[in-house]
Amino acid sequence: MSKPIRVRYAPSPTGLLHIGNARTALFNYLYARRHGGTFIIRIEDTDRKRHVEDGERSQLENLKWLGMDWDESPETHENYRQSERLALYQQYIDQLLAEGKAYKSYVTEEELAAERERQEAAGETPRYINEFIGMSADEKAKYIAEREAAGIVPTVRLAVNESGIYKWADMVKGDIEFEGGNIGGDWVIQKKDGYPTYNFAVVVDDHDMQISHVIRGDDHIANTPKQLMVYEALGWEAPEFGHMTLIINSETGKKLSKRDTNTLQFIEDYRKKGYMPEAVFNFIALLGWNPGGEEEIFSREQLIALFDENRLSKSPAAFDQKKMDWMSNEYLKHADFETVYALCKPFLEEAGRLTEKAEKLVELYKPQLKSADEIIPLTDLFFSDFPELTEAEKEVMAGETVSTVLQAFKAKLEAMSDEDFKPENIFPQIKAVQKETGIKGKNLFMPIRIAVSGEMHGPELPNTIYLLGRDKSIEHIKNML
């Protein structure tokens, strides 16, 4: 009988939720939900130097915003933070010490640095050399006594089987193996401050929580042999491992970096700019996984039903901000008006634009929005000075038929009564100008659009003119003549 599927997302509360970590959480979530398993949130907070106040809350809030839920977490279960599990780690460290599978190491940071420098100068691969090699029992006892008398606090190191082979069938990359002799020597499982290192604590946690599958980024591949060593030392069965490919910047082809200013990399950024969470969820789900076919827009329920771990990509996933914005626009275009207006409202309110026209303006620009904050620059025409024309727009307005078109359309607007001034009546007036002047197509519509709005492209022209108002529209046209 196969083990129940239990997967986890285990963030460190060291900052905001990054797109890469969000993908790790999302793939674990989809895997659990697809197979009727359990999705667990565990907080790995043993790195006290990098601990950020509110880091845990930020992680959980942003996961919830994306639409993920979980079955077990620090919110519902005790000891789901590593800082609450120190006694458990100590229990297993003591066991390994008692069995001779680990030992206390008194070498100082200065000595380690000097040895590393010597090895590099000699062209050797840096590795820890067991400080007790060649010592008799008496010499070892004397060495330890002297070090402790000098106040040196030891670390605890795992005794590595240098001839061991550590291999696994990776869910994404296939068979991977490491030789024990290439790990870098005996490695620290407990730091001087008493906290366990990541590669030790994560094994204890995964075993204790009965994790069946560990799905994470391939930057963790080098950690896996060390973790397999701990499973071996403690006599435990290891879970299955799957290492997702890196996310790269589609423009540079390099690993996505926090210095890449052409991308929004933190979930908080998408929240602040007014993206729909469903769009961000959909986009992240396709970073390194492909359901097959041409379709790219999927609901959360569809993604759960379609998710197949065998379709996780072996090639790097390209993060394309333009693709994200295209997908976001698709979601906003097809969302109900109330949803989009609720996203836009805070931005309109902050800008002092929550007027009687606010709903109409959101309706007008809804098809263009990639994020709700764009409602402000898009509606500048209605609240700010007329924009400066671009060179391309000036070129259009220099056309020989422009004056004829604008004079004729201005006359049509002036002749309209207040009662008749409605979007459905404005378009026939433009067509009437075409009939009277014989000017049509771009030569007709483009000068009117630029004269009224200062832009070559935009929403439906009659609606723009209506919301701008007859007097304002006439004023703008006069200024162009």
Curated annotation (Swiss-Prot):
ATP binds at residue 258. A motif ('KMSKS' region) lies at residues 255-259. Transmembrane segments: none annotated. A motif ('HIGH' region) lies at residues 11-21. It comes from the Bacteria. The keyword Zinc does not apply. It catalyses: tRNA(Glu) + L-glutamate + ATP = L-glutamyl-tRNA(Glu) + AMP + diphosphate. Pfam families: Anticodon_2, tRNA-synt_1c. It is an enzyme of class 6 (ligase). It is found in: Cytoplasm. GO terms for biological process: glutamyl-tRNA aminoacylation. One of its GO terms (molecular function) is zinc ion binding. Its EC number is 6.1.1.17. One of its GO terms (cellular component) is cytosol. Catalyzes the attachment of glutamate to tRNA(Glu) in a two-step reaction: glutamate is first activated by ATP to form Glu-AMP and then transferred to the acceptor end of tRNA(Glu). Monomer. Belongs to the class-I aminoacyl-tRNA synthetase family. Glutamate--tRNA ligase type 1 subfamily. This is Glutamate--tRNA ligase. It comes from Streptococcus pyogenes serotype M3 (strain ATCC BAA-595 / MGAS315).
